[in-house]
Every structure is written in structure tokens, then in C-alpha cells.
Swiss-Prot record:
tRNA processing recorded as keyword: no
Protein name stated in the entry: Trigger factor
Any GO BP: cell division
Catalytic activity entry: [protein]-peptidylproline (omega=180) = [protein]-peptidylproline (omega=0)
Species: Magnetococcus marinus (strain ATCC BAA-1437 / JCM 17883 / MC-1)
Swiss-Prot/TrEMBL keywords: Cell cycle, Cell division, Chaperone, Cytoplasm, Isomerase, Rotamase
Function: Involved in protein export. Acts as a chaperone by maintaining the newly synthesized protein in an open conformation. Functions as a peptidyl-prolyl cis-trans isomerase.
């Protein structure tokens, strides 16, 4: 077998493979004999059909089968011989196979990039340091009160921020109603910013029974391209205003927050402990993002187009599934194939490069994890969704799932690698409030 490789740029390779005529003839003869033994034709005993007739009736399919077999045998061998690692499947340029002649074909491939990480030790990093304050705890308690608030209908009272309004509305652009711009008995908490900027502000002060027009401009980056940047008028009819009444901070509220014993003080203590854990988690995530950002800045790399295209397809598929779960059709929001690609192209490149860099660092620095590290990641997930006997069942189920187990192993190895990179860096502590830390994450 002869193998010739032509480089067409950084990643593109044309591999021309020639299989000797002797092997071609041997396989043709073997396949012909096999077909003759199996075929049944009227007037001939089994295995006695003339070779010429076999050739006339089945020659094309036999040659196609032999060509396929020759490719399956020779292509992996050629890759191994030349030390090539292809991205995806090859694009084949096949010539028709003929008896007595060598079989030659060309496989067009893209090869995996070889990334040699640099400047990954000694990175300058900032570690957020947060001390949980009483005010942070009170903020959470306020949210608990808001979540357990009761609403009472108010007659003749002007709506204020925090009130709940029930109203009908219909939107118009250039005098024409648009799809998705109409609703009846819609319930909205004023000040929640669920609508486009300026909409809710114009509802404040309205009373039950009022009819009013709300004038807004859709943002330039609004997800429905037919509405982006356009002025709209919403005709609204207010049906009811309900004011919010917050419950007292007492033992009953503590129970609603999941603290069955110890009352208000126990609730505050539990909230404090939870915020400490949350701050630690967010701080670690923040440092991880710093590490990733610096790795990308220090290691710019080109990538094969097939690799990027595949990653974009995976990311788009995941996004579409998420929209589907929410009952949203992305096409109705103006998403096109080009929109999807533009949205994920850069993220896809970064994800691939980071994966290659991290893998290379793991290999160079001989970083390893044990089963306990994997188990810790499984436990962390199980604790979020289950307790008691069901938690044990879920854990056992996850450990039997090879694909999920590999995901946990990958997450554990990534965590260890990031921790190692942080240890090799220069870390400066920076005091932050809990609010600042969380806002930075968002």
C-alpha cells in the first residue's frame, strides 16, 4: 500500500492511498466466489451459476463492496502510518475499481490542532474575599417575606411599584397589531422589569378600570428582529390592582423558610451559613473564569473549521432544546441559521481551545484524580435533587451510567486542574461585599 499526503494549509490534508492490484484481485475473486455460492437463479443448481453471469448481474455491486472493504482496511492504516488524527469523517474521491489494476482514492481530511500551552503558570489572579453582613441576611429575609406575601384587591387606589396588576393589552407597530403582542387577564408585578424598558413605569399610578396607552421602543437587540428598534403603542385596560402585604418576621415565617425549630434566630443562622457557602462558591467560579480568560489571552490558536462547526451545532442543539422545554419557537423570535451561528461561533472556538489547553496541561503536569474526587462530584449533584433512600438510589444509578460517570470524572479533573493553576499563580485578595460579588457573577 502506498500513502501520499499533501498539505493544503494549516489543517487540511489530502491523503492519496493506493492498494496493490494483487490485493484488489484477491478480494474481487473472494467476493465473487462468495456471491456465486449464495445466489439462486432459475435453471442452475446452487453454486453452479456461471462466473460470467455472476459478473453481468452482480459485478457492479461486488466491485462497490470490495471498494468499501478496501477503504475500511486501508484508511485507518494510512492514518496510523502517517501519524494523522482526523477531525470527523473524510471527504472521499473514489475512482471505479477495476480488476487487474491498483485501487487509488483520495481522502480529504482536517487534522486535530496540536496546542502547546504557554504562560499558564505565574498568572496574576484576584481572589474575592467576602464577609457576610447582617444586612445580607436581612436582604434574604426580605425575599422570603416577598415570596410569602399576600395580595389584597384595592378599589380606587393608584398602582404603585410592588403592586400586582391584572390587565388586558394589545400592541401595535405602525398602526398594525403584531403577533405575540396581545393578552387578556395578564398578571404583572409592577417593578419586576419583566416587560421592555419603560412599559411598567407607565402603568404606575393607574387605577382599576382605567384605559391607557403605553408608548415604548423595542431595544435594538430585541430577539424578534421584526420588532427590534421599533416604536410601539400598547393599548391597555386595567382590571384590578392588588397591594402586597408582607408577613411578619416570626416563627411562622421561619417555618415557611424551611426552619422547623429555633424560630427567627435559627433562620438567620441558617441563612448566614448558606450565604457563606454561596460566597465561597461564587468566588471560586470567579477565579476559574479569570484562569480561563488568561489562558485564552496567552494562547491564541487557529482551529479546523470542521471542529468549530461541530461545536456550534452541539451548542445550537442544546439551546433549541432549552427553548422547546419553555414552549418557545425560536423561529418566531426571528432566529435564523445565521443568527445561531453568529451567536455561538466565538463561544464555540473558546470552548474548544480551552478544552485542548486544559487537556494538554493535565498531560504535561501529570495531573490525576482519584475515585473519591469523582464521588464528591456525584454527591454534590445528588444532594441538590434528592434525600434519604432516593438519594442512595440516584447515586447508584449515576455510578452505573458510564457516560455520566465520565462527565463527573471530567468535571473533577477540571476542578483539580484549575486549583493547580491557581496555586501556580500570584493571588491578590480583594475585599468585596456579597452584593458586589453576586452582581459581578450576573
Amino acid at each position: 500500500m502506498e500513502v501520499n499526503v499533501v498539505e493544503n494549509g494549516l489543517f487540511d490534508r489530502d491523503i492519496t492511498i493506493t492498494v496493490a492490484a494483487e490485493k484488489v484481485d484477491a478480494l474481487l475473486s473472494q467476493e465473487m466466489t462468495k456471491t456465486a455460492a449464495q445466489v439462486r437463479l432459475p435453471g442452475f443448481r446452487a453454486g453452479k451459476v456461471p462466473t460470467k453471469m455472476i459478473e453481468q448481474r452482480f459485478g457492479a455491486s461486488i466491485r462497490a463492496e470490495v471498494a468499501e472493504q478496501l477503504f475500511r482496511d486501508s484508511y485507518p492504516t494510512a492514518l496510523m502510518e502517517k501519524g494523522l488524527r482526523p477531525v470527523g469523517q473524510p471527504e472521499l474521491d473514489l475512482v471505479e475499481l477495476e480488476k487487474g489494476k491498483p485501487f487509488t482514492y483520495t481522502a480529504k481530511i482536517q487534522i486535530f490542532p496540536v496546542i502547546e500551552p504557554k504562560d499558564y503558570t505565574g498568572m496574576s489572579l484576584t481572589k474575592p474575599v467576602v464577609t457576610i453582613q447582617d444586612s445580607d441576611v436581612e436582604t434574604v429575609i426580605t425575599r422570603v417575606r416577598e415570596a410569602n406575601a399576600e395580595y389584597r384587591t384595592q378599589e380606587g387606589v393608584a398602582a404603585a411599584s410592588g403592586d400586582r396588576m391584572t390587565f388586558d393589552f394589545e400592541g401595535f407597530v405602525d398602526g398594525e397589531a403584531f403577533e405575540g403582542g396581545k393578552a387578556e387577564d395578564y398578571v404583572l408585578e409592577l417593578g419586576s422589569n419583566r416587560f421592555i424598558p419603560g412599559f411598567e413605569d407607565q402603568l404606575i399610578g393607574a387605577k382599576g378600570g382605567d384605559a391607557l396607552e403605553v408608548k415604548v421602543t423595542f431595544p435594538e437587540d430585541y430577539h424578534g428582529t421584526q420588532l427590534a428598534g421599533k416604536e410601539a403603542i400598547f393599548k391597555c385596560v386595567v382590571k384590578a390592582i392588588e397591594s402586597r402585604e408582607l408577613p411578619e418576621v416570626d416563627e411562622e415565617l421561619a417555618k415557611k423558610a424551611g426552619v422547623q425549630e429555633g424560630g427567627v434566630e435559627a433562620m438567620k443562622q441558617e441563612i448566614h451559613e448558606r450565604l457563606v457557602k454561596e460566597a465561597d462558591k461564587v468566588a471560586k467560579q470567579e477565579m476559574k473564569q479569570q484562569v480561563f480568560k488568561l489562558l485564552l489571552e496567552n494562547n491564541p490558536n487557529e482551529l479546523p473549521s470542521q471542529m468549530v462547526d461541530h461545536e456550534i451545532e452541539q451548542m445550537v442543539a442544546t439551546a433549541k432544546e432549552e427553548y422547546s422545554r419553555q414552549g418557545v419557537d425560536p423561529e418566531q423570535l426571528g432566529f435564523t441559521d445565521e443568527t445561531w451561528r453568529n451567536q455561538y461561533a466565538e463561544k464555540a472556538k473558546e470552548r474548544i481551545i480551552l478544552g485542548l489547553l486544559m487537556g494538554s496541561i493535565v498531560s504535561k503536569e501529570n495531573l490525576e484524580i482519584d475515585d473519591q474526587a469523582v464521588e464528591a462530584h456525584i454527591d454534590a449533584l445528588v444532594q441538590q435533587f434528592a434525600a434519604g433512600d432516593y438519594a442512595e438510589q440516584l447515586k447508584a444509578q449515576l455510578k452505573k451510567d458510564k457516560a455520566r460517570l465520565e462527565e463527573f470524572r471530567g468535571a473533577a479533573l477540571e476542578e483539580k486542574t484549575v486549583a493547580w493553576l491557581i496555586e501556580q499563580g500570584t493571588v491578590t485578595e480583594e475585599e468585596k461585599s456579597f452584593e458586589e460579588l453576586v452582581a459581578q457573577r450576573g
